[in-house]
Every structure is written in structure tokens, then in C-alpha cells.
Amino acid sequence: MLNSLLPADWLYLERIVRFGETDSAGVIHFYQLLRWCHESWEESLERYGLKAADVFPNILNKEKQPLVALPIIHCEADFWKPLQTGDHISIELLPKKISAGSFQVTFKFKRGDNYVAQALIQHQAINSQTRSCCELSTKINSWLAESLCID
């Protein structure tokens, strides 16, 4: 583990629905849910102890690129209840390793005691230079392994 936190510290997050994330009816635009998923995953990695620069490419610094890139190869979302401006929501991340080179994260969105949406995003590891499939990085493997220890 990169820090002394428990998995719940990096797998349970919160946010508030902002006005700019909604349409004229005050309900979130559908694509915001997938944006929130990615932001939640980034925050989870940061809370775990992984720096963004160790995981995500930096177009401005070609010399300090991660060897492994993690493009999204599949995503899906289900909406059960509308989310509106000002709603306080909790987001639970449920990572799962699929193979030596891929993993997925299920995101469960809850308002109060009610689940309002769920999404899934799958990533495939590729060599950032050759663009061919490869194994996940040690750091992502550690995040996955320790995330699966949650009760």
C-alpha cells in the first residue's frame, strides 16, 4: 500500500450536482455521468497515493510519459432516477481485474439511501509507444489488488 488508508478511503467518494452539469430542465446531461466516473477514478488513484503523472500521459512533457497507457475500450450507463442541481451524491467504485492487461470499474451512484445510476468503464493496457496490448503497470495492479480487499 502506498499509504495508511483503508480501501473505503479511496473507493467511496462524494460530490454535488452543479448547475452547469444540467440541462434546461435541471436534470444532468447523460454524458456527465461518464465524466464523473473518470473524475472519481482519478480521485481514487490520488487518494490511494498514485500521482496523475504516473498514470496519465502529459502532452507537454514527452520525456516523462508512463510506459503503459489505459484507453477506455467499453463503457455503459444506466439511469434510474433523475439527478438535479444541488443533489448530494455518493459514488462507490468497484474495481475488478479482467486479465493481466485489462480491468473494469463499476460506479454506483447513490442519493441518500437510493441508487440513482450505475456505470461501468473498461480499460485495456497498451504500451504507450508501440500501442500494442501489454500488462497493467505495477502501480495499477497494486491499486486493484488493495481495492479488492474491501469488506
Curated annotation (Swiss-Prot):
Protein's pathway: Cofactor biosynthesis; phylloquinone biosynthesis; Quinol/quinone metabolism; 1,4-dihydroxy-2-naphthoate biosynthesis; 1,4-dihydroxy-2-naphthoate from chorismate: step 7/7
Gene3D superfamilies noted in UniProt: Hotdog Thioesterase
One protein family per Pfam: 4HBT_2
Gene Ontology biological process terms, A to Z: phylloquinone biosynthetic process
Keywords: Hydrolase
InterPro entries, sorted: DHNA_CoA_hydrolase, HotDog_dom_sf
Active-site residue list: D23
UniProt function note: Catalyzes the hydrolysis of 1,4-dihydroxy-2-naphthoyl-CoA (DHNA-CoA) to 1,4-dihydroxy-2-naphthoate (DHNA), a reaction involved in phylloquinone (vitamin K1) biosynthesis.
Family: Belongs to the 4-hydroxybenzoyl-CoA thioesterase family. DHNA-CoA hydrolase subfamily.
Protein name in the entry: 1,4-dihydroxy-2-naphthoyl-CoA hydrolase
Organism: Prochlorococcus marinus (strain MIT 9211)
